[in-house]
Amino acid sequence: MIRLFRKTSLTTLTDEQLISRVGAEQDEKAFNELYSRHARRLMGFFLRAFRYDEDEAADACQETFMKVWQAAVQFDSSSAFRPWLYTIAYNLCRSRFRHSEQAERYRSEQLATTAETYEDSSELQLDNATLQLALASVLATFPQESRTLFALRFEEELSIKQVAQVLNIPEGTVKSKVHRLLCQLKQQLHDYE
């Protein structure tokens, strides 16, 4: 018997093809493939947003993927999946910060956590740990919007266009905010030394 159609391996499909399958067919295997591709990085995004509170980050990550499942049918197949995912994650962060008083607690805890990490670092990692400590300390003093912008652009490595989509602002605004943020970081890190 000759097979006219071959089963497509999910690993060869793009994120956009997978989310389209989730939306059209509620394909759990396609959803699981998306989860396996993006959960780790998304967890890292939430860990930074929630100041390394693993429980809060895990809850937010799970809630984001629940929202992805529920909203998959609304995904615009002409757009990219990753900015859409991070838009959901960003909006969830904003909502959680708006409805809680954790932001201040996280700022003070971040300094203590970073100092502990620094003390535990080995001699070989001393310079990197010093830089990471300084960067984390400086970023902890910045507003949530600036920390989110930094995370999306430099830690999640989204393009300017993708960051603009996630934050729902013009690309030019993203460019100017990134430039201003980098200038502020440069100045404060210079002052930190």
Spans of model-derived segments:
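Sigma70-family region 2
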Residues: 23-24, 48-52, 63-80, 99-100
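Structural recognition of an alpha-helix C-terminal capping motif at a helix-to-coil junction
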Residues: 59-66, 79-91
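Arg/Lys-rich amphipathic alpha helix in sigma70-family domain 2
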Residues: 73-77, 87-108, 180
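Short, charged helix-capping/linker segments at alpha-helix termini
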Residues: 3-7, 23-33, 43-63, 171, ...
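DNA-recognition helix of helix-turn-helix
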Residues: 135, 146, 152-155, 160-161, ...
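C-terminal edge and immediately downstream basic/flexible tail or linker adjoining helix-turn-helix-like DNA-binding
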Residues: 1-10, 52, 105, 134-137, ...
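Short helix-capping/turn signature of helix-turn-helix
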Residues: 37-40, 48-50, 151-158
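Internal acidic/polar
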Residues: 11-16, 95, 103-128, 132
